[in-house]
Amino acid sequence: MIEYRKSVTVHGREIGLSTGVLAQLAGGSVLVQSGETAVLVTATMASKPREGIDFFPLLVDYEERLYAAGRIPGSFVRREGRPPEKAILAARLIDRPLRPLFPKGFINDVQIVATVLALDMNVPPDILAILGASTATMLAGIPFDGPVAATRVGLMGDDFIINPTYKEIEEGELDLVVAGTKNGIMMVEAGANCLPEEDIIDAIDYGYEAVQAMLTAQEEFIRDLKIEPMAFVAPANDPVLVSFVEEKASEAVAEVLRSFELSKDERDAKLDAIEAELGTTFAGLGEEDPLREKAAANASKLPALFKSTTKKLMRKQILVEGKRVDGRSLDEVRPISSAVRVIPRVHGCGLFTRGTTQVLSVVTLGTASDAQELDDLHPDDSKRYMHHYNFPGFSVGEVKPLRGVGRREVGHGALAERAIVPILPEHEQFPYVIRVVSEVLSSNGSTSMGSVCASTLALMDAGVPIREPVSGVAMGLIKEGDEVRILTDIQGIEDFLGDMDFKVAGTRDGITALQMDIKIQGITLQILEAAIQQSKAGRLHILEKMLIAIDKPRVELSPYAPRLLTLKIPVDMIGLVIGPGGKTIKRIVEETGAKVDIEDDGTVVVSSIDGAKALAAKQIIEGMTRTVEVDKVYLGTVTRIIPNLGAFVEVMPGKEGLVHISQLAEHRVRKVEDELNVGDEVVVKVKEIDQKGRINLTRRGIHPSEVEEARGQ
C-alpha cells in the first residue's frame, strides 16, 4: 500500500494522519502525530463471528513504551510489564465512545491497539489515540458508524483551551474530554476544581465544536482511500418467535415491573421465574408447531428476546407513566443512611448506603515514603492521594474468583479519586499521604458515586481537613425518538436497560468530576445540559443526608494514626543529617523510634504514632542543623581530650569545637585533664569560626548570667 497522509489543524495545532508504511498486515493501521507525540493505532477483526455470545467482543489496549519518553523501565527485568493505571484509563477512554457505534448483533472479535511511540510533553497522546482508533477501524473495513473524535478542554483563568499541555492541565481549573460524532456527543469525562454547572456545559459545547474538524478529516481520509466497510446485516429474529415471547411473558413481566414494593432480589427472582416458565412452555410445544422446526436455535434466542421484552416494558412504563420499577418518580433518590467509625482501629471510615447499594470506605494516613511512585511515561510522577475500589462477587450475590483488580475497578477508583482530589488540603497544611479503599458490600447501581460519598465521610472521620464535603449521583436516560426522560440515581436494572450512565460528583458550590457513557449513537447538548442541571438537586439532597452522620472533619486524628512534625533544613545540610551510608539518620531512628523522611528541598517529615518520639527526633535534627553563632554561649559536652592541645566540645548534635588549652580557664592551665574530662558538661562561648568552618571555643570572659542562660536552655 502506498503511503497516504492527511493533516488537520485544530485550534492552531496540526494533527497528522498517515497510513501505508507501518503495520501493513493489521486490518487497519494509522500513525497519528502532533508536535513530537506519535501514536500508532491498529484495528484488527476476526474473520468469523464468535458464536454463542450476546455481547460485542471489543478489546482495546493502550500501550505505553517508555522509550517514547527516553526512559528505561525501573522494573527488575527493565521491561514494561502490566499496564500502569494511566494506560488502563486511556484504554477505557478509547473504548467508551467507540463501542456504541458498532452495529447490534455484530459479534466478530475486534482488537484495537494504540502504542505510544514518542511523547512530547506538550501533547498528551490519549486524544490522538481516540482519533487513531476511529480511523484505523474504518481503514480495516469493520462495520462501524463512525467517525468519532475527541478533544480535551482546559480552563486557565476565564479562557478555555483546546488540547492543553500537561503543564496547563496541572495548573488549570478543568480537565475535560469530550468525544462525539456528527450525530451527537458520545462521551464526556472531566475533573474540575468545583466549577459551576454552567461552566461545565460551556466547556462541553466548546470541545464538541472543536471535534468537528477531526470528523471531517477522517471522512476525507477514508473517502480518498476508497475504503468500503464490510457489509453486515444483523440477523433478524423470527417474528413468530418474537410474538410467542411477548404473548407469553409481557403481562407477567409488566405486573412485576409495577409491583413497586418488591425488593431487588424479589424482583429478579420473579423475572427469572417468568423466563424459566417461558422456556418450559417453549419446550412443551407440539411437534406440529412451526417454532419447533428449529427448536435448538430458537431456544437459544429466548433469553435475548425475554430481555428485549423486559427492556421495552420498563422503558414504556417510565415514558408513559413516569414511574420506575421501585415506584420512585424520575428525579427521586433512594433512601439513604450514613455512618462513621463502624470498625475499630482504622484511621477513619465511612459507611454509605443508598437503596441496596452499600459502600464502606476506609482511610489510612501515611508519610511521604508511602507515596506511590509511578513508573510510566511521566518522569518523577508520584501520588499523595490514592483511591482503590474493590468490587467482590458477593456484592451482587455471585460466586466470582478474586484474581486481582480489573479494568472496571481501576476506572471506578480513578473516578472517585478525581472527585475527591480538588477538596483535599494543601500538602503544607496536611503533609500526610492518604490512601482510601472503597469496599463495595452491596451493588444495585452507582457504586462509584457511593464510593465518593463513603470516602467523604471517611476522610472527615479521619480528621483530614477537607475544604468541602463531596457527594455524587448517577443519572440515567430513556430516549425513544423525541421522547426523553432523565432519571436521578439509577439502579442496576435502569443502568442495564437504559441509554445512559452519567455520573456527577461535586460540592455545594460546583462539580469536581463527571463521566458520561451512552449506549445509543449520540445525544444532544440540550439533553446533557438537562441531566447536569437535574443532577445538582440530587447531589445536594444526598449531601444533606450524609452530613447527618458527620458534618465536619474531626479535630483530632485517630490515636492509631502517625503524628507528623515538619521542619526545614538547609539543602547543604541534608548530607549531614543522613550521614555516611545513612549512619546518622539510622541512629536517630533507632534512638527515638520515629520515622524520618527527607525531601530534596530540605523538608524533613518526622513521624511516629507516639508524638513524644516524633518530637524527640525533630529536636535532634534541629540541633544538628542549627547554625552556630559567634559570641554565643552554649552548654556542651566534652567529647575528646587532646593532651597539651585542648578539648573538643560538642555544642550541638554533630557540631564540635576546640577549646584550646590557653582558653580553658582564666588562669594558666598546665594539663588539660586537670580542668576537663570526657563526658563533662561545660559552658563555652564561640570565639570564632575560621574560613574552613572550624569552630574555636573559649571558657574565658563568660559572664555568670550567660552561664545561667546556657544551662537553662
UniProtKB/Swiss-Prot annotation:
Which cofactors does this gene product need?
Mg(2+)
Biological process (GO) annotations? mRNA catabolic process; RNA catabolic process; RNA processing
Q: Which residues form the KH domain?
A: 562-621
Q: Which InterPro entries match?
A: ExoRNase_PH_dom1 (IPR001247), ExoRNase_PH_dom2 (IPR015847), ExoRNase_PH_dom2_sf (IPR036345), KH_dom (IPR004087), KH_dom_type_1 (IPR004088), KH_dom_type_1_sf (IPR036612), NA-bd_OB-fold (IPR012340), PNPase (IPR012162)
Q: What top-level branch of life does the organism fall under?
A: Bacteria
Compartments in which it is found: Cytoplasm
Q: Which reaction does it catalyse?
A: RNA(n+1) + phosphate = RNA(n) + a ribonucleoside 5'-diphosphate
Q: Where is the S1 motif domain?
A: 631-700
Residues binding Mg(2+): 495, 501
In the record, what terms sit under GO molecular function? 3'-5'-RNA exonuclease activity; magnesium ion binding; polyribonucleotide nucleotidyltransferase activity; RNA binding
Q: Record's GO cellular component, any one?
A: cytosol
Note whether Magnesium occurs among the keywords: yes
- Fetch the Gene3D superfamilies from UniProt: GHMP Kinase, N-terminal domain, K Homology domain, type 1, Nucleic acid-binding proteins
- List S-S links within the chain: none
Coiled-coil regions, chain positions? none
Sorted UniProt keywords = Cytoplasm, Magnesium, Metal-binding, Nucleotidyltransferase, RNA-binding, Transferase
EC number(s) stated in the UniProt entry for this protein: 2.7.7.8
Q: Which family does it belong to?
A: Belongs to the polyribonucleotide nucleotidyltransferase family.
Q: What does this protein do?
A: Involved in mRNA degradation. Catalyzes the phosphorolysis of single-stranded polyribonucleotides processively in the 3'- to 5'-direction.
Entries under HAMAP family matching the protein: PNPase (MF_01595)
Can you name this protein? Polyribonucleotide nucleotidyltransferase
Write down the species.
Gloeobacter violaceus (strain ATCC 29082 / PCC 7421)
